[in-house]
Every structure is written in structure tokens, then in C-alpha cells.
A protein has these predicted regions:
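The feature captures the beta-strand-to-loop junction immediately N-terminal to the Walker
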Residues: 37-39
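Conserved ABC ATPase "signature" region
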Residues: 98-113, 163-165
Length: 228
């Protein structure tokens, strides 16, 4: 899991001469869930937009070691209401083998709902659909921008389990943005703490062993709360 797949190198971003992101450095590894934890409005979404190329950094470099496509799971599912679930997944890659679409729908537990329209799906199912769509577009790297925040606790943790399943079964690298410490501890292997104005990565916390040791898990939670 230590193979680098994506690196942010000295990334800074200004809006109208106001510095928003300041010297952001981190690396993503193959087959890990990397958490990005910080308060709302600090610049986490801006950083994700830079990673996928929809915004340009003021300075610094993004290194994508395999020139991999990057899939994006937004806060809102952004499914097209006039398309079926199958069509929503297919639209990101019209020439793709439909077998892959079926595999991804099955992976997220929606194979039997392929002909449903978004209005017929629950909030959790719609987000599963958006995950299937992101998977179909990009098989190696996914960015999750707080996509579970509007869901109840049960659904949130079902989708966190799905995220861990993608890592385990497909070796997918995931950058998971959240402001929820409990979610981060439950799902992530490492957590980056973003804070300050302008925003910086203040600390990296490795928590992959804390799930085995209950005492260590409590210590990590205390450490995270202190950092935030």
C-alpha cells in the first residue's frame, strides 16, 4: 500500500490576491483511504478541484504517476433526473464495455435497480449510483467530497463500508474529505488535518493500526480532536 499514486507538491491557491491554500504537500498511496479532515469552508473542495483539474493552482504541482483518470463523488449525487440509473452510469464513458457498468452496479448493490430513475431511488441509493458512475469513469483514484453528510447515521456507515470494500476488493485509492472525526477514524488509513487561514496541512496521523487496539483508537480520537 506504500506505492505513490498521486502527489500534491507545494500547492497554493489565491482568489483575488487572497491566499486560500498555502503550500499543501501530501501523497496518496495505491489502495488506501486517505482522509482530509477540516472545518467547512476551509478550502478542501478547492483542493479537490485542483486535483481533478477543474481549477488551476496558483503555484505548485500535482503529480499523477500513472496519468490515471480521477473520479469525483460530490456532496450532491448529481444524477440526471431524465436518465435511468444505467444511463447515468454509462454517460461518463459512452464507449465502455457495458459489462463494466453491470459489474459496478453490482459492486454498489444496485444491479436490480438499473432501470430506475433517480426520483425512484432513496438518498443512499442515489449516492451509490454516483459512486458507480465515478468508478466507471475512473478505476484507480476516487475523490469523495463529503458525499454522506446529508444521510442518517445508518446510511452513512453503510456507505463508509462500501468505500472500504472498494479499497479491499478493487485496490482503489480514495481521498475522503470530511469534517466528521468518527467517519475518518472508521474508514481511513491515514488522516491529513487541514486548518488555518490560509489553510495548511498541519499534521498527518496514521490510524491503520488503531482499529486493532481499542486503547490506541481512543488515543487517536483524542489526538484528532486536539488538532481540530
Amino acid at each position: 500500500m506504500d506505492k505513490k499514486i498521486l502527489v500534491s507538491k507545494s500547492i497554493s491557491k489565491k482568489f483575488d490576491e487572497r491566499l486560500i491554500l498555502d503550500n499543501i504537500n501530501f501523497e496518496m498511496h495505491s489502495g488506501e483511504i486517505l482522509g482530509l479532515l477540516g472545518p467547512s469552508g476551509i478550502g478542501k473542495t478547492t483542493l479537490l478541484n485542483i486535483l481533478v483539474g477543474t481549477e488551476k493552482q496558483t503555484q505548485g504541482e500535482i503529480i499523477n504517476f500513472h496519468n490515471s483518470k480521477i473520479g469525483y463523488v460530490f456532496q450532491e449525487d448529481r444524477l440526471f433526473e431524465w436518465l435511468s440509473l444505467f444511463e447515468n452510469v454509462k454517460i461518463v464513458s459512452e464507449n465502455i464495455d457495458e459489462k463494466i457498468i453491470w459489474e459496478n452496479l453490482s459492486l454498489v448493490g444496485l444491479k436490480d435497480y438499473y432501470n430506475y430513475f433517480p426520483k425512484e431511488l432513496s438518498g443512499g441509493m442515489r449516492q451509490r449510483g454516483s459512486i458507480a458512475r465515478a468508478l466507471t469513469f475512473a478505476a484507480n483514484i476516487l475523490l469523495f467530497d463529503e458525499p454522506f453528510k446529508s444521510l442518517d447515521v445508518k446510511l452513512r456507515f453503510e456507505l463508509l463500508d462500501l468505500m472500504k470494500k472498494l479499497k479491499k476488493e478493487k485496490n482503489i485509492s480514495i481521498l475522503f474529505v470530511t469534517h466528521d472525526i468518527e467517519e475518518a477514524l472508521y474508514a481511513c488509513d491515514r488522516i491529513l488535518i487541514m486548518k488555518g487561514q490560509p489553510a495548511k496541512i498541519s499534521k498527518e496521523i496514521n490510524i491503520s493500526n488503531s482499529r486493532i487496539d481499542h486503547k490506541l483508537s481512543i488515543e487517536k480520537e483524542v489526538e484528532l480532536k486536539r488538532e481540530i
